[in-house]
Amino acid sequence: MKSMFKLSALFVAMGITALGVAPVAQAATAPAEKATAVLVHGAFADGSSWDEIIPSLHAHDLKVVSVQNPLSSLADDVAATRRALDAQTGPVVLVGHSWGGMVITEVGNHSRVQSLVYVASFAPSVGQSINDLAKDYAKPSGLDHVVVDKEGFVTMSFEGISQHFAQDLPVAKHRLMTATQGAIRGAAFDEKVSVAAWATKPSWFIVSDQDRMIQPALQLDNAKKISATTIRVRAGHVPQLSTPKEVIKAILDAAKLNNE
């Protein structure tokens, strides 16, 4: 009996030891979660404006969310983007095109956001609106081709889309973009940001040298102000469609920062 008791005690001891080891194995560090690219479109557009780059981002094992902004106010677009950020579980590269730069500047202090990518965009300081940013630069030619409805919402004519917004894309794309564009409330261009997320988050900036909607000089000055990694492209206002490789690379570079 004593031998059996000793053997049982040995087995119990071994069991206790095994139980002690198991939690250590389970506590092994899990692989870092891949970043999600949250894409924020601009005025006169919708979430499909990112269609050219989304498959490549997926191919590089990034998750992607393309926000559908209501374009009814800065606050409404920030709320839509914040909901998308709240739904993520890992680090986020927050990307904004054109007016979307206002949105990511305001909401980019979200805890999930690790880096910002501005694409032919605005990067305001606290207390600045788009009209504040643009007042010291020549009026872009594209702004002569906007249509304002009786409720103050603004769209672009086909001529504006084809000759000034996306002059470096084929005519079939012009027709599609004109048909699917989002109308933005004109008063939004006077709305000011209360946060400048770029002050605390690493930033990238795609500057479009042939932009006819936002002066390239304004883009360059904004990129310099925020100390962004700056990439210049020979493109119109939608480089994510006309020169997608450069935009994809900037997003991937920002994502690598998250996964180091």
Give the predicted meaning of each segment.
Residues 1-11:
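Bacterial N-terminal signal peptides that target proteins for export
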Residues 95-100, 104:
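Gly/Ala-rich beta-loop-alpha elbow adjacent to hydrolase catalytic centers
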Residues 176-198:
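Active-site nucleophile elbow and catalytic-triad environment of alpha/beta-hydrolase enzymes
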Residues 209-235, 241, 254:
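Conserved loop-alpha-helix segment in the C-terminal half of the alpha/beta-hydrolase fold
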Residues 205-207:
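Short beta-strand/loop motif that positions the catalytic acidic residue
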Residues 9-20:
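Bacterial N-terminal signal peptides
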Residues 109-113, 117-158, 185-188:
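Flexible "cap/lid" loop of the alpha/beta hydrolase fold
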Residues 30-89:
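Active-site catalytic motif of lipid deacylating hydrolases and related acyltransferases
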